[in-house]
Amino acid sequence: MIIVKDNFCEDVEELRKLALSQDYIMHRYFPGGSVAWRGFRTWELTYLNNPLIQKYAEKILNLAYETYNLKDQALHKFFHISYEEHKQNRIREWHTDPTSHAGVLYLTPNPSSESGTTIFLDGKRNDIKNKYNRLVMYPGKNKHGISSFFGDSKESGRMTFTFFISDREKFKRDLSELNKLRERHDHGYSNRYFKF
């Protein structure tokens, strides 16, 4: 089942401002090998300990619990920005995630509506349109990907709050590994961060 919820955040402008203020790393510089995503992504956002991020992480988890009958899950969360130019850097158009569920919250005002998320469910292609403050959530095992890209700057690019839901033990292991990568990366490659 695919969840689509419009007007998800009461204070979406504050969340967008927070996203614009973060450091990002480009896909080609992400440590640990090749990644399926293209563009710029923050490190996992738990380390910020930000009340706004925690508020929406809890809201997303509660929606997942109610809809998918999940228990004892945790949420990996990132801000992600991609530009029109990133469509040429795609290794694979569609992918799956090794998590129970995944999703995005669109954070670009007045986006290209065709730049949403394509999700394959029961053999059928579903093109969910990009709309500011729209949440989309789906099972991670279903093939999915960005429908199309747009923009060429932090203000005009395709911005999302991207999340992955998994059981708490997997979350702890994954977060520990991500933090180790971040610490190693911070010591030797801080010049590869993309600061707007």
Predicted regions and their residues:
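Peripheral, non-catalytic segments flanking oxidoreductase cores
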Residues: M1-K17, D23, R28-G33, S166-F196
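Catalytic core of non-heme Fe(II) oxygenases with the double-stranded beta-helix
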Residues: S82-F196
